[in-house]
Curated annotation (Swiss-Prot):
Protein name as annotated: Protein FixB
Family annotation (Gene3D superfamilies): HUPs, TPP-binding domain
Keywords on record: Electron transport, FAD, Flavoprotein, Transport
Binding residues for FAD: 255-283
Taxonomic source organism: Escherichia coli O17:K52:H18 (strain UMN026 / ExPEC)
One example of a Gene Ontology biological process annotation: carnitine metabolic process
Gene Ontology terms, MF aspect: electron transfer activity; flavin adenine dinucleotide binding
Function: Required for anaerobic carnitine reduction. May bring reductant to CaiA.
Subunit structure, interactors included: Heterodimer of FixA and FixB.
One Pfam family recorded for the sequence: ETF
Record pathway: Amine and polyamine metabolism; carnitine metabolism
Taxonomic lineage: Bacteria, Pseudomonadati, Pseudomonadota, Gammaproteobacteria, Enterobacterales
Length: 313
């Protein structure tokens, strides 16, 4: 048997739902989707869900992952085994841990390949900081996986599809985290997964102010802006949602223009599927040039304005 009888999908990020649903279609006979609202439910059905389970009643001061209890109960009530697919977002991983505990299921994070052999999930993902690929065969009846962006192509919606909708009511967990305040985060996030052209900056750009040079290039060629993990996580120059690498975005654009990025394996795992890689780096020995189809050795701060002017003609 090379499919599960049931797969359960949930995404806290709506843009990740189509790829998870495409993966679900390849891995199971029946697709169930947990959703937070009616609009997401309608989308899930168009993407192939046979059953939609609307999570309902969570107090405003509680976290989405506190639905784990009723989600696990619902999963158990509808089969003695099954596969759970979640995005590898921070919330997705928190929810995966809670579901794994409640379902007594193995949890595998950042999966880049998923297959089913003899009714068991086989998962591949990066290990040792991206230096190797590990393969795991999950033996527990339930398997909970967080999926790296780009692992599956996005499913295409079909408005003619039909499915059944159910409601799952909130049940307060015995131990819960209560949200005491929220702070809006300014973000210009885009769906980088769908971008044809990507300009990505690393710490070699020099400063946060210099990112404006990359933004001007993006405007000139119609590209989207991304970054390396240190730019987002260490320097805080850009949003977390824009960093490319093993634990976040896995992109497949037509062009990936890496500016001031050294090219460590942890980053290149997220960019190496690009059709063409163009690198700008002042270090001629930077690892990025081992991956690049084209490269310029030089100061990005000087090269970017000239490149922008040439391409804007």
């Amino acid at each position: 048997m090379n499919t599960f009888s049931q797969v359960w999908v949930f995404s806290d990020t709506p843009s990740r739902l189509p790829e998870l649903m495409n993966g679900a279609q390849a891995l199971a006979n029946q697709i169930n989707a947990f959703v937070l609202n009616d609009a997401d439910g309608a989308q899930a059905i168009q993407l192939g869900a046979n059953h939609v389970w609307k999570l309902n009643g969570k107090p405003d001061d509680r976290m989405i992952e506190d639905y784990a209890g009723v989600m696990a109960d619902t999963i158990r009530q509808h089969g003695a085994d099954g596969l759970v697919l979640l995005p590898n977002t921070r919330r997705g991983k928190l929810l995966a841990a809670k579901l794994g505990y409640r379902l007594k299921a193995a949890v595998s994070n950042d999966a880049s390949t998923v297959s089913v052999q003899d009714g068991k999930a086989t998962v591949k993902h990066m290990v040792y900081g991206g230096l190797a690929i590990g393969e795991e065969r999950i033996a527990t009846p339930y398997a909970v996986l967080t999926i790296s962006s780009g692992t599956f192509d996005a499913a295409q919606p079909d408005a003619s599809r039909t499915g059944e909708t159910h409601t799952v009511e909130w049940q307060a967990p015995a131990v819960a985290i209560t949200r005491t305040a929220t702070q809006a985060r300014q973000s210009n996030s885009v769906d980088l997964d769908k971008a044809r052209l990507v300009v990505s900056v690393g710490r070699g750009i020099g400063s946060k102010d210099n990112i404006a040079l990359a933004e001007q290039l993006c405007k000139a060629i119609g590209a989207e802006l991304a970054c390396s993990r240190p730019v987002a996580e260490n320097e805080k120059w850009m949003e977390h949602e824009r960093y490319v690498g093993i634990s976040n975005l896995m992109l497949k654009p037509e062009l990936y223009l890496a500016v001031g990025i050294s090219g460590q394996i942890q980053h290149m795992v997220g960019a190496n599927a690009s059709q063409t890689i163009f690198a700008i780096n002042k270090d001629k020995n930077a690892p990025i040039f081992q991956y690049a189809d084209y490269g310029i050795v030089g100061d990005a701060v000087k090269i970017l304005p000239a490149l922008t002017a040439a391409l804007a003609r």
